Amino acid sequence: MHVISKSAWRDAVAKDPALERPIGEWHKVAKHAEWKNLAEVRKVYPHADPVGPYTVFNIKGGTYRLIVKIEYRWQTIFVKHLLTHAEYDRGGWKQ
């Protein structure tokens, strides 16, 4: 899959350098994936959850939430947000 809009995670890594490895591992898996639907995503990431039009991944042991929009038809992932668990829970990202 082609991963677009990585600036959200670059900003998060600048704030927490320990994110670099786990987000890099996620990216490595995602860019080589050919997912056709959420069921296929969950074979690799069982805790990936659909939230409206987005898919949410736990990153760094659940400390962070990676929010993406996956266009399976075009094999493209748009990174929307990389938030701490607390930021995610506040829900402002949904607007």
Predicted regions and their residues:
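Catalytic Cys-His active-site segments of thiol-dependent hydrolases/isopeptidases
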Residues: 79-83
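Basic, Lys/Arg-enriched alpha-helical interface segments
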Residues: 1-63, 71-76, 86-95
